[in-house]
Every structure is written in structure tokens, then in C-alpha cells.
């Protein structure tokens, strides 16, 4: 018979093991697998069974294909990284934007409910109008100003129809792996330009909270591990800055003398309106025990080649 002390020790060991691994999903289905965020989602769950689908293997805008794939796979979690991210292009192709950013999410939410899976869906800071003077809380009222933003907001609503859904709002994603050939974000382009000695155009009047993709992936794993309550979670690196400040920080980390062309949003013709103040607060994510590092820390880790 085990002693009481040994039994307690074993129980504590088991509890710690469960907290690290047992609460995590065994099978993860990832959509939009050719994108940068999905790349790191697949990596962060490398100790799980991951089924990753690109647009070629699963058209998420086809409800029957979604239902059939989810039923056949029976995942514990669906992580939706598929999205129409061309903000200006959405003004010219609203049907395509809503099909991928909203209706596809409805199909995934319904399929997740049918198999009892948790749905993780990524949204955007663009659901806000940018009129705030301090970082937007997770529960702040949205006010989309473009077709893209509206399609993402409707996608959030559809995602939250699923009984177990985590909607994670990210912003200005960056952190493409070395030799990455896929789509790159604004900060990736800024750093590339600085490295190559090109003149880089940056906004002086847009405030952002950049999101480092490996940190977003780690936060996603954490929320699933602690079985976070369904709802909306802001997932950005701590702090905020103008694109001008971000570019200057990147140049300092790179050790280069930057050639920067400063502009305001009013000076650049854009088809879709952008919110000027996009800082997000991570109150709910922090309350689960996960503290996002500062954007400066994340930028430094990325530029110096540190990632997952």
C-alpha cells in the first residue's frame, strides 16, 4: 500500500503532467496551412497529431467539403487560419471576402459543433474604428470601417455560434521564417527594405500593436491547455507604437542607418479606410496566466533569428 506522502506526491506529479499535456487536444485540424501563422501553429503542436489543409486540399468556402472533412477527421480542435486578407482588394471583391472571412467560418463552426470540437478563429484589430485614445479592451464595441473589417466581424459572430469557440484578434502579424516565400506582412516588408538599404515608406499617424506569429501560436496552445472560456481574446504583443517608431526600432536592432520616408494616411490613396489607432489590450489573455512579451522584445527575437 502506498504511503500518504507518496500518494500525494504522485497526485501532484499527475496534476502537473495533466496541466502541461493532458488538457491539450490530441488531434488538431488546421486550415489555411500555407500561411505564415498556420506555419507556426503546426510547429507549436508538433507533439500532437496535426492535419493541415491548404486551399488545394480543403476549400473552406464549400460547406459540404468542410462538413465531410471534419466528420472524417474528428478533430479535437479546428484552428482556422484561412482568410481573405487583402484589405483594399475586399472593396473590389466583397463577395469573395465575405465567403472566406464569414460564411466559411459559419461552416467550420457548425462542423465543429457536430463533432464536439473547439474552434479557434483569428480576427483583426480592423473591427474597430480607430477613434479610441487608449488600447481597445477585448469587450470594446466594434465599428468596422471597410468591407474587409465588416467581413471579419461577421466571421467572429459566426465563430461564436459554436459552443466552444476562441476568437483571437491579432494585429500586424510579423515573423516570417527564413527563406519564406509566402505572403508577408507590413513589418516583414519594412525589415526586408531596411536590410537591403532601400527607402522605406512608413506611416507616422497609425498606431499599432504588432503580433509576432510564434508568440500568437504559443498563446493559442496556452488557451487550449488551460481550457479557456469561450469568447474573444486579444492576442498582440505588449505595448503599441506608430509605424514610424516600429521602423526606427527595427533599424536599431539591425544596426543600420535607415532611409525612411514618413507619410500620413491622408497622403496615401487607399481604397479601404484604415483605423488610425489600433492598439489592443490583452486583459483576458493575461487573466489566463499568459503574458505576451513586448513588441520590442518580439521584434528583437525575430531579427536575431530566435523563434520557436
Set out the residue ranges of the language-model regions.
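C-terminal amphipathic/interface module of NAD(P)-dependent oxidoreductases
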Residues: 15-17, 273-308
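N-terminal Rossmann NAD(P)H-binding glycine-rich loop of SDR-like oxidoreductase domains
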Residues: 28-44
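NAD(P)H-binding glycine-rich loop region in Rossmannoid oxidoreductase-like domains
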Residues: 60-100
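NAD(P)-cofactor binding segment of oxidoreductase domains
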Residues: 92-120
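Mid/C-terminal beta-alpha module of Rossmann-like enzyme folds, strongest
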Residues: 219-220, 226-271, 276, 303-304
Amino acid at each position: 500500500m502506498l504511503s500518504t506522502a507518496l500518494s500525494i506526491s504522485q497526485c501532484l506529479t499527475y496534476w502537473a503532467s495533466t496541466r502541461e499535456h493532458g488538457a491539450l487536444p490530441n488531434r488538431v485540424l488546421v486550415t489555411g496551412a500555407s500561411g505564415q501563422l498556420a506555419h507556426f501553429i503546426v510547429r507549436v503542436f508538433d507533439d500532437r497529431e496535426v492535419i493541415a489543409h491548404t486551399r488545394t486540399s480543403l476549400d473552406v468556402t464549400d460547406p459540404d467539403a468542410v462538413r465531410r472533412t471534419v466528420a472524417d477527421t474528428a478533430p479535437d480542435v479546428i484552428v482556422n487560419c484561412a482568410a481573405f486578407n487583402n484589405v483594399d482588394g475586399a472593396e473590389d471583391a466583397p463577395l469573395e471576402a465575405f465567403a472566406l472571412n464569414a460564411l466559411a467560418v459559419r461552416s467550420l463552426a457548425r462542423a465543429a459543433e457536430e463533432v464536439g470540437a473547439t474552434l479557434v478563429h483569428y480576427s483583426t484589430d480592423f473591427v474597430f474604428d480607430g477613434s479610441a485614445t487608449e488600447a481597445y479592451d477585448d469587450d470594446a464595441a466594434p465599428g468596422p470601417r471597410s468591407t474587409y473589417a465588416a467581413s471579419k466581424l461577421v466571421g467572429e459572430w459566426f465563430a461564436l455560434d459554436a459552443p466552444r469557440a476562441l476568437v483571437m484578434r491579432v494585429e500586424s502579424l510579423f515573423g516570417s521564417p527564413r527563406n519564406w516565400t509566402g505572403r508577408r506582412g507590413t513589418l516583414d516588408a519594412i525589415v526586408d527594405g531596411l536590410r537591403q538599404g532601400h527607402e522605406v515608406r512608413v506611416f507616422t499617424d497609425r498606431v499599432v500593436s504588432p503580433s509576432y506569429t510564434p508568440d500568437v501560436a504559443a498563446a493559442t496552445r496556452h488557451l487550449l491547455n488551460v481550457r479557456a472560456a469561450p469568447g474573444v481574446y486579444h492576442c498582440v504583443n505588449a505595448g503599441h507604437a506608430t509605424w514610424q517608431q516600429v521602423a526606427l526600432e527595427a533599424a536599431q536592432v539591425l544596426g543600420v542607418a535607415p532611409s525612411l520616408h514618413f507619410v500620413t494616411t491622408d497622403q496615401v490613396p487607399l481604397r479601404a479606410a484604415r483605423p488610425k489607432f489600433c492598439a489592443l489590450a490583452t486583459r483576458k489573455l493575461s487573466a489566463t496566466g499568459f503574458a505576451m512579451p513586448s513588441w520590442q522584445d518580439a521584434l528583437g527575437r525575430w531579427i536575431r533569428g530566435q523563434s520557436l
